[in-house]
Amino acid sequence: MVLETISKIIKTQLPAYLKKFPLPETIGGFARLTVLDWLRLLPLLGILALLGYLTIRPFLPKKKKQKDSLINLKIQKENPKVVNEIDIEDLKSTNVCYCRCWRSKTFPVCDKSHIKHNELTGDNVGPLILKKKIL
């Protein structure tokens, strides 16, 4: 079924399309084409543009990977790592660390991704540590 459809397209529909194809013999002939002729040319021009792009794409410059940017721009820049500890009475577990670098795989819980981030960027961001307040 699929092969019959492809065969019909190649053997009958493609030659019929190419017979009606308004390809002028000279460059100046393109100026005399009607709107209907240009509409008939669009599929071929689209395919040629796609093939041209796919041909030159390997030679185009690759996008440079954007360097990780700083998160902490001005808070406690004199400290090697900014970590805040907060005591909370109603906390169910003893310690909870929350990520502030937005790189954690277990976000919002900190997985120490800030260490690699700090090494790469020179930043000093650290986790937010919530401790259970002992009365």
Swiss-Prot record:
Ranges of the Lumenal topological domain: 1-37
Membrane-traversing stretches: 38-60
Main location: endoplasmic reticulum
GO biological process: autophagy of mitochondrion; regulation of autophagy
Sequence positions that bind [2Fe-2S] cluster: 99, 101, 110, 114
Described purpose of this protein according to its UniProt entry: Regulator of autophagy that contributes to antagonize becn1-mediated cellular autophagy at the endoplasmic reticulum. Participates in the interaction of bcl2 with becn1 and is required for bcl2-mediated depression of endoplasmic reticulum Ca(2+) stores during autophagy.
Designated name of the protein: CDGSH iron-sulfur domain-containing protein 2B
Organism this protein belongs to: Salmo salar
